[in-house]
Amino acid sequence: MFTLAHLSDLHLALTPKPSELASKRGLGYINWQRKRKHIHRPDVLAAITRDLQARSAQHIAVTGDLTNFSLPGEYAWARRWLESIGQPTDVTVIPGNHDVYVRGAEKLPAKFWSDYIRGDDGLERFPFVRRRAEVALIALSTGVPTGPFMATGRLGERQLARLAEALEQTRGSFRTVLIHHPPLSPARRFFRRLIDGADLRRVLVEKGAELLLHGHDHRRSLVWLEGNGTRKIPAVGVPSASAYAKYAKEDPAGYNIFRIEGSSGNWRCETVSYQRGGDGAISECARYRLY
């Protein structure tokens, strides 16, 4: 059995310098001061981290938005947090839209997290593939700079083509796709959607996958996507790992543990969700079989 932990959307935030407020960060900082700083709290993340570590998962996937304004100081803070939860070989990271908040931030993930965003082939490009026991982790990046009031993501043709190749090359493994933006968003979330989500879904229909993990929505969710053949693909979302229950608009902080075993055509996968309640206690809140 292989145990995989999934958490997302830490939103580690520092105060931008005055010179940095002329960009999109200025509007983001106003929003942070008005409400988001009350939601995303380091003490909540610390509690979630301690609880997660006690579960002794074999691998941890972090699906983006580790930072809030994509400041170098936030990246360094996130790096220290990553080092606290595991070795780079045991932790896989992808960026989210907040990690590429403004132009110029695209280079920061490789600068600060290079050994956490590198595949088994040693190359720093997306998607990258990490094989761990019977699981093949296929990591994508949807983080692109966007204008004010936008939180969209994009994969692009090159990344989609490489994804198709990776899914084909890892056929027979428990292929787990890591992505920040969900592959399917309701119309009301137009400004937060994955722009080429339909293209991603077409690749998944053509090549198949066993599991897709995402963040972005700050909600615990499960959506079944069309896959290759008769079996559908579970797309599982997770809440923000730092969301304080009292002020969270969506679900309070939590994470998931996946227990995976079996072989191609005979997989078994159980998901257990943990959540930090209003009283500060972290407990199991859901358990279900995907396979």
Predicted features and spans:
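Extended active-site neighborhood of metal-dependent phosphoesterases/phosphodiesterases
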Residues: 72, 76-162, 202, 229-231, ...
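Conserved beta-sheet core of the metallophosphoesterase superfamily
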Residues: 189-264
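Active-site neighborhood of phospho(di)ester-bond hydrolases with catalytic His/Asp-centered motifs
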Residues: 6-8, 59-65, 91-97, 141, ...
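Beta-strand-turn-beta hairpins that frame and shape the catalytic cleft
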Residues: 1-5, 16, 129-139, 168-174, ...
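Active-site environment of divalent metal-dependent phosphoester hydrolases
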Residues: 11-14, 68-71, 97-105, 145-149, ...
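Short acidic, glycine-rich surface-loop motifs adjacent to enzyme active sites
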Residues: 170-186
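A short C-terminal boundary segment appended to hydrolase-like catalytic domains
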Residues: 260-291
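N-terminal active-site segment of His-dependent metallophosphoesterases
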Residues: 1-75, 83
